[in-house]
């Protein structure tokens, strides 16, 4: 196979879903049937091939996305297994950035759950074409048709049903292929390796015809010529239908819906056929956005083997045998071990040593990789998640990834002096792997503070510190990551002067501070004209503001959601310096924040509780007592779904309360929504504690 057309044969896909929808099991089966796993790994026995960290095998949830290469028909499939727990959405976000297509796995009983919505929105953000696999069709309460409706209602997506289930719950036997109009039935005794096609059962004929018509009505809209043919009563061929499904999937006109039971080994091979048949190859994606370093211009770069080398680092992992591994997705050109490339974000050269193709937890050395490939590089010195590696002579920076701010923090202290140094190393390694995990020092207390996306996120970090780095630490109680902001516009004119023999210091700045909408962060703009402040001093002003906004004026929390506009200033030929302007900016900030009617902000979480009807009243009462605002209540099967916005500060230990309120029958999920003002009486308590 030549390198050029090799791109047509590659599928870079992610498998993503809500926790417990059966994502890892589905991936396991794919690896089994494509010949990569000789033994099927069961998640609930703690032996799945993709879940390779000890914590994952214990908890039965996937934390880090392992990248795996396998083959089906004549195609190469690179699979990224993504976590479904809400504390790990960063992993999903990273994976989606480098994928060409995705399979969204849904639980046939629960349907579209909160995390499914989050992942779906993330995939929308990166325009990832996807298909839906409704799993667990063998389970009590599984309902394929209700799931399809939920995909429509909850995700606002256009499902294209291309399979129907044959039998339901314990009688689930196989599927009806609506393209070929055949039933596909699995033999139970052969671990799903043997299946055969037969005529559609008589009791399913009418339903199959109905859904076949719906399928044709939807796909022919993509091609006027075939639509005319269809409307005039001519037969649309199987090849034409498959071509239209592929085109519609790639353009996101609709999302093919398949079904099966990965655990019972049914429906996985047709899912693989659909992955290679309908999801895009890198050629279908065609381009990647980036910036040309020499000109600073944003451009579209073609995905091609013949173009100069460009790749995105999307994951860093500590491997017990190889050390630090950097996973890259190559967009163009090729790379060989021993060659030198440049990290264009850090402007540092990197020498390529070992290159590995990964299969969940074992590895294969390769000497060369090219456009479309996902490989792991060992021993890179300066590259972190989101960096671009590029050809030295034709440098580009690919579109960067955005990472969410952490919402929860903990103080950690090493148990002994021997642990002190090891802890520093462990935390810096873990922070390099995970951009949503931050480490800082509290200067007042001298404590090390770790910040993350939720209690489970930080629990796992501490666990890894203990197991992988042998660091024992004392852990403080979780703290909320409060923020501060201003609520009115103010203008500050500040002059910094210092004269005490020798060279003095002089800088004058006039800055307008104004509030922004929630989520807009901090924005700095210079409107200096006519050289009132020379160009070389302006970065000093921005640096000063950026540094000082980390400690707000109410209780010392970082300031967010405001804009600082530099409108005027003055300088002195001898006494002005970058440092003088930095000091002036900091003083102007202090004054401006106090005049801008500052307010304390707290993270508000979107909480979704699924409960049997009889506990509904108690659960709503409890959420209200936690300052929760109920957003909606929806019936789902034999349960109620309560969605509310609740301050994170009120949610610690909620899992135990919910368990006792509902005798363990209700479950909840929580995801960060936005920052909002803290009521004044509560703000006073928080200030007093600081």
From Swiss-Prot:
GO terms for molecular function: GTP binding; GTPase activity; translation elongation factor activity. The keyword Protein biosynthesis applies. Residues 8-283 form the tr-type G domain. InterPro entries: EF-G-like_DII (IPR053905), EFG_II (IPR041095), EFG_III (IPR009022), EFG_III/V (IPR035647), EFG_IV (IPR047872), EFG_V (IPR035649), EFG_V-like (IPR000640), G_TR_CS (IPR031157). Keywords: Cytoplasm, Elongation factor, GTP-binding, Nucleotide-binding, Protein biosynthesis. Its main location: cytoplasm. It is found in: Cytoplasm. Belongs to the TRAFAC class translation factor GTPase superfamily. Classic translation factor GTPase family. EF-G/EF-2 subfamily. This is Elongation factor G.
């Amino acid at each position: 196979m030549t390198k050029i057309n090799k791109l047509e044969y590659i599928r870079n896909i992610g498998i993503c879903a809500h926790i417990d929808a059966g994502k890892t099991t589905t991936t396991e089966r794919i690896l089994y049937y494509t010949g990569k796993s000789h033994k099927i790994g069961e998640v609930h026995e703690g032996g799945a091939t993709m879940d390779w960290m000890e914590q994952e095998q214990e908890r039965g949830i996937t934390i880090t996305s392992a990248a795996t290469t396998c083959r089906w028909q004549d195609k190469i499939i690179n699979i990224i297994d993504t976590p479904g727990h809400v504390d790990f959405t960063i992993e999903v976000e990273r994976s989606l950035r480098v994928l060409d297509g995705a399979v969204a796995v849904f639980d046939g009983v629960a349907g579209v759950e909160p995390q499914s919505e989050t992942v779906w929105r993330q995939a929308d953000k990166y325009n990832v074409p996807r298909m839906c696999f409704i799993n667990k069709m063998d389970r009590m309460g599984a309902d394929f048709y209700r799931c399809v409706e939920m995909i429509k209602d909850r995700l606002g997506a256009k499902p294209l049903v291309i399979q129907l289930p044959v039998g339901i719950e314990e009688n689930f036997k196989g599927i009806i292929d609506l393209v070929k109009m055949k039933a596909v039935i699995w033999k139970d005794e052969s671990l799903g390796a043997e299946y055969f096609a037969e005529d559609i059962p008589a009791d399913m004929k009418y339903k199959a015809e109905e859904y076949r018509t719906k399928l044709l009505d939807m796909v022919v809209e993509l091609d006027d010529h075939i639509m005319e043919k269809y409307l005039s009563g001519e037969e649309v061929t199987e090849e034409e239908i498959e071509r239209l499904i592929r085109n519609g999937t790639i353009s996101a006109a609709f999302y093919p819906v398949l079904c099966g039971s990965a655990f019972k080994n049914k429906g996985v091979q047709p899912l693989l056929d659909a992955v290679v048949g309908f999801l895009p190859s890198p050629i279908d994606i065609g381009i990647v956005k980036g910036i040309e370093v020499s000109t600073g211009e944003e451009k579209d770069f073609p995905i091609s083997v013949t173009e100069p080398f460009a790749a995105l680092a999307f994951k860093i992992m500590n491997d017990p045998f190889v050390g630090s591994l950097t996973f890259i997705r190559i967009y163009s050109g090729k790379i060989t071990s021993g060659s030198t490339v440049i990290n264009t974000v850090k402007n540092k050269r990197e020498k390529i040593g070992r290159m590995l193709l990964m299969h969940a937890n074992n590895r294969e050395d390769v000497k060369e990789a090219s456009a479309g490939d996902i490989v792991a590089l060992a021993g890179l010195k300066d590259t972190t998640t989101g960096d671009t590696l590029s050809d030295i002579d034709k440098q580009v920076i690919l579109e960067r990834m955005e990472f969410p701010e952490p919402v929860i923090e903990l103080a950690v202290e090493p148990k002994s002096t021997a642990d002190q140094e090891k802890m520093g190393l462990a935390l810096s390694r873990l922070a390099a792997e995970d951009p949503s995990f931050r480490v800082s020092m509290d200067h007042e207390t001298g404590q090390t503070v770790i910040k993350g996306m939720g209690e489970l996120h930080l629990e796992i970090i501490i666990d890894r510190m203990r197991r992988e780095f042998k660091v024992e630490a004392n852990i403080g109680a979780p703290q909320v990551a409060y923020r501060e902001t201003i609520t009115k516009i103010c203008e500050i004119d500040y002059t910094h002067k210092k004269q005490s023999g020798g060279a003095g210091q002089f800088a004058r700045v006039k800055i307008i501070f104004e509030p922004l909408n929630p989520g807009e962060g901090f924005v700095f703009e210079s409107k200096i004209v006519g050289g009132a402040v020379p160009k070389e001093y302006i970065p000093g002003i921005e640096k000063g503001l950026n540094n000082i906004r980390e400690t707000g004026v109410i209780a010392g929390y970082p300031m967010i959601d405001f804009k600082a506009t530099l409108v005027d200033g003055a300088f002195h030929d001898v006494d002005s310096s970058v440092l003088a302007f930095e000091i002036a900016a900091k003083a102007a900030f202090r004054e401006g924040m106090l005049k801008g009617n500052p307010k304390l902000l707290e993270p508000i979480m979107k909480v979704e509780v699924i409960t049997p009807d009889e506990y509904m009243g108690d659960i709503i009462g409890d959420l209200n007592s936690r300052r929760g605002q109920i957003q909606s209540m929806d019936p789902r099967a034999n349960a109620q779904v309560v969605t509310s916005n609740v301050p994170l500060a009120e949610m610690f230990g909620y899992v135990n309360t919910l368990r006792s309120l509902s005798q363990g029958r209700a479950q909840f999920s929580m995801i960060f929504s936005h920052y909002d003002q803290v009521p004044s009486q509560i703000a006073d308590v928080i200030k007093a504690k600081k």
